[in-house]
């Protein structure tokens, strides 16, 4: 495991940087510092109330453990990760893959879990998005309805904190006028301003209005090696999904040499849809509302020794 400190500007400064970038991509933009809403309430229903306290980002495993061929031996545990990053009992959100050993299939994992510590058991409110074997539609399930463990597999991008209330960055945008998706626009805004000073943000956002393109990995791993982005896209199942979507997002402005996935967002809903977010498909009507917090520390866990850039979108 490797770790380093992020550059952590003030919340007010980050607001200003994000706003300047978002205005090039959305017609209506508001970015302010505010008290984190109670995220234990609808529609989020997290096991904690906030996104604050000892914030950090963990990049675990990586795409090279999925493509060209899956490494099914790569199994990780949320409680172990929380301890490894010095935060037992952490609230963890983000995007990753399920463990084949836990579920007997491949699927998208949408993290929302409070890890265990000496005094509490883990509270896992994560979701699993898989391809319905009956009709090929998306099947969204609560992780706890499938398994009682807290494992995941292959790769994940996680934001961890104490789950406390506190000040966060609220981002509200409507009507997309540029080409970048919501997350890419924010990440690129930070990169343009801070350059090689890595800034990491994690949080949750709502697709309040409109629709978005998402993918879900098939239950069966590819029989043929996935050597190119075209191979990967041919294997994935793509869907257009409707609002409201609750999206768990982790993004980093600059990779300081750790072979990071710079952005990764997975979504769940209360109407049975979820998966890996790509971009909205309804620019004229789209509306996003998000709450984010900068991470203080970066942890790189089980970095693949042989890497590539396939399948990073």
UniProtKB/Swiss-Prot annotation:
It comes from the Eukaryota. Its EC number is 3.1.-.-. Its cofactor is Zn(2+). SMART domains: DUF1907. Its main location: nucleus. GO terms for molecular function: hydrolase activity, acting on ester bonds; zinc ion binding. It is found in: Nucleus; Cytoplasm. It is an enzyme of class 3 (hydrolase). GO terms for biological process: DNA damage response; regulation of DNA repair. Zn(2+) binds at residues 264, 266, 276. Keywords: Cytoplasm, Hydrolase, Metal-binding, Nucleus, Zinc. It holds the Pfam family DUF1907. InterPro entries: C11orf54_DUF1907. One of its GO terms (cellular component) is nucleus. Monomer. Exhibits ester hydrolase activity on the substrate p-nitrophenyl acetate, in vitro. May regulate DNA damage and repair by regulating HIF1A degradation via chaperone-mediated autophagy (CMA). This is Ester hydrolase C11orf54 homolog.
């Amino acid at each position: 495991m490797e770790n380093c400190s992020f550059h952590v500007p003030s919340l007010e400064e980050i607001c200003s940087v994000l706003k300047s970038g978002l205005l090039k991509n959305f017609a209506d933009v508001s970015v302010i510092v505010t008290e984190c809403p109670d995220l234990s309430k609808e529609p989020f229903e997290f096991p904690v109330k906030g996104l604050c306290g000892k914030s950090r980002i963990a990049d675990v495993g990586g795409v090279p453990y999925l493509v060209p061929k899956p490494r099914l031996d790569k199994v990780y545990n949320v409680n172990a990760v929380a301890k490894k990053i010095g935060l037992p009992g952490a609230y963890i959100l983000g995007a990753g893959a399920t463990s084949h050993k836990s579920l007997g299939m491949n699927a998208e994992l949408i993290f929302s879990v409070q890890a265990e510590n000496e005094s509490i058991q883990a509270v896992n409110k994560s979701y699993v998005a898989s391809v319905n074997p009956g009709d090929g539609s998306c099947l969204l399930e609560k992780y706890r309805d499938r398994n009682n463990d807290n494992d995941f597999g292959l790769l994940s991008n996680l934001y961890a904190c104490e789950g406390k209330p506190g000040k966060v960055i609220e981002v509200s945008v409507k009507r997309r006028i540029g080409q970048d998706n919501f997350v890419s626009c924010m990440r690129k805004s930070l990169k343009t301003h801070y350059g090689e000073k890595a800034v990491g943000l994690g949080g949750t956002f709502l697709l309040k209005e409109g629709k978005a393109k998402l993918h879900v990995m098939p239950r069966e791993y590819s029989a043929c090696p996935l050597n190119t982005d075209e191979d990967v896209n041919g294997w994935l199942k793509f869907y257009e999904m409707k609002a409201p979507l609750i999206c768990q997002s982790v993004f980093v402005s600059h990779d300081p040499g750790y072979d990071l996935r710079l952005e990764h967002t997975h979504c769940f809903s209360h109407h049975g849809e979820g998966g890996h977010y790509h971009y909205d498909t309804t620019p004229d009507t789209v509306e996003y509302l998000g709450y984010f917090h900068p991470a203080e520390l970066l942890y790189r866990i089980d970095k693949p020794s042989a890497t590539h850039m396939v399948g990073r979108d």
